[in-house]
């Protein structure tokens, strides 16, 4: 995660168009079902839901249809949130780095989708994120997120692909270093502006995390792991895992 320039400036509207992809729509549906199932199983009454690293809000806005729910969308990209605000004024949008997450409200549920947590490049910083999320949740609150595994980054290594998104084109190239465990994604966008195409380069880095690493971070931050699911399997190997965590209640003092 970088605190320098916004890598999505100039392409946020195109990223928003990608949400129309049928495969992505299936992911959104999967996450909604998993969270609602988890809420039902725990008998949780949700008043506030926080969607972290929400991008242009495609995973956030559908929750505004839930009666009695207050929805908060958090992202570090001002460009992404400008696009999100155009689509809904029923979400409380907040531009901030989730490593330093601060909210005035506490929530019963928090979500973070599309391997967004893989953008946090060190275990120390990801542990910090877990602490911050625990701080904004009520005891018994749920944290649902997904993580891409190393299998995914190894599979993507040195693969290139040309995508067509509406009238836009994007050439994607990927590199993964197993020693540093850092993946580099380079996206060259060609966006029509009148009679010409404007080129935009987006470069982001990600890092895989193991199930054992996530479990340890969860425990350290006061969570218990309720569910780990293989959300996506490629060539017989899990490439994306879905986690459901529950914030533990505070320990009661022992009476003599």
Language model segments and positions:
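C-terminal lobe and adjacent flexible extensions of AdoMet/dcAdoMet transferase-like proteins
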Residues: 211-256
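Conserved class I S-adenosyl-L-methionine
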Residues: 1-44
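A short glycine-rich, Lys/Arg-flanked "PGG" loop and its adjoining helix->strand segment in the class I
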Residues: 127-139
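A short His-aromatic
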Residues: 118-120
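A short acidic, Gly/Pro-enriched loop at the edge of an enzyme's catalytic core
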Residues: 102-109
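SAM-dependent methyltransferase
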Residues: 144-216
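Residues lining the SAM
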Residues: 113-115
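Class I SAM-dependent methyltransferase SAM/SAH-binding core
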Residues: 50, 57-100
């Amino acid at each position: 995660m970088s605190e320098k320039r916004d890598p999505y400036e100039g392409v946020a509207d195109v990223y928003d168009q990608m949400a129309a992809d049928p495969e992505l729509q299936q992911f959104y549906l999967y996450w909604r079902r998993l969270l609602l199932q988890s809420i039902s199983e725990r008998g949780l009454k949700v008043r506030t839901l926080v969607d972290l690293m929400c991008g242009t809000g495609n995973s956030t806005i559908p929750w505004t249809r839930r009666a009695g729910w207050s929805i908060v969308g958090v992202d570090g990209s001002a460009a992404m949130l400008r696009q999100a605000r155009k689509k809904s004024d029923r979400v409380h949008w907040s531009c901030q780095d989730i490593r330093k997450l601060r909210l005035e409200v506490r929530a019963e549920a928090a979500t973070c989708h599309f391997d967004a947590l893989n953008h946090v490049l060190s275990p120390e910083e990801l542990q910090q994120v877990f602490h911050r999320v625990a701080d904004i949740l009520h005891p018994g609150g749920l944290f649902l997120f997904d993580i891409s595994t190393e299998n995914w980054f190894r599979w993507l290594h040195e693969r290139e692909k040309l995508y067509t998104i509406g009238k836009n084109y994007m050439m994607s190239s990927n590199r993964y270093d197993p020693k540093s465990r850092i993946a580099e994604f380079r996206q060259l966008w060609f966006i029509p502006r009148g009679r010409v195409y404007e080129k935009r380069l987006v470069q982001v880095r990600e890092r895989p995390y193991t199930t054992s690493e996530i479990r340890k971070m969860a425990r350290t931050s006061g969570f218990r792991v309720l569910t780990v699911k293989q959300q996506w399997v490629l060539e017989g190997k899990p490439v994306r895992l879905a986690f459901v965590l529950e914030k533990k209640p505070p320990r009661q003092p022992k009476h003599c």
